[in-house]
């Protein structure tokens, strides 16, 4: 078990919720705006304290120092572009600073693979202030993935992403999910807040459905994301259809 969260809470934004996360598991937090998704993810990072306890690899988050946490997990928060000006390659290099000395060939190999996956290899010589919103988000995603990339950081266990698909178009979003699945297949547990419910239905191994700070359901996507539960939570009409052997959600209001 990678994460064991017991009665995690930060009232009134998040009421007590308990769950566990296994190695290689992709967990999606879904729910309306203000339901507690970002709060839950921030508390899993160990940077924000509330009530309850989160254990990472059987040890309380509060017993780790920041340097140790940086090697075990990466937290990609929602944030605007920083005020400083730096090149994309330099920015990505900063993501590896917590890992100490690394083999240059291994770094270049990982950098090539991640940048190719997110289609930002041609952006490495650009300044981050010159990037579009979608380009900047992909650079941030690349930096987060590099921090916990298994060949560079064998201690890494957890990737926390708060609405990582923000500003991405459908092609870029597809590339992101492919990269996330690749990391999960290497044993990295991934927790992310998400608004694309069809993606959650297809991509998540486990779902936590939040509403008004409460976890109203958790489990497999097919069990949690029923028409009745989604209509009640999002206050809109939902239809579930089958297309090419896959379930799809239609929002008809």
Regions found by a protein language model. Name each.
Residues 30-32:
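The feature captures the beta-strand-to-loop junction immediately N-terminal to the Walker
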Residues 45:
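Helix-to-loop junction immediately C-terminal to a conserved catalytic motif
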Residues 52-60, 68:
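Conserved ABC transporter NBD signature motif
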Residues 107-123:
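Conserved ABC ATPase "signature" region
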Residues 127-131:
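Conserved ABC ATPase signature
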Residues 194-195:
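H-loop/switch region of ABC-family ATPase nucleotide-binding domains
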Residues 207-222:
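H-loop (His-switch) and adjacent beta-strand-loop-beta switch element
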Residues 232-253:
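ABC ATPase nucleotide-binding domains
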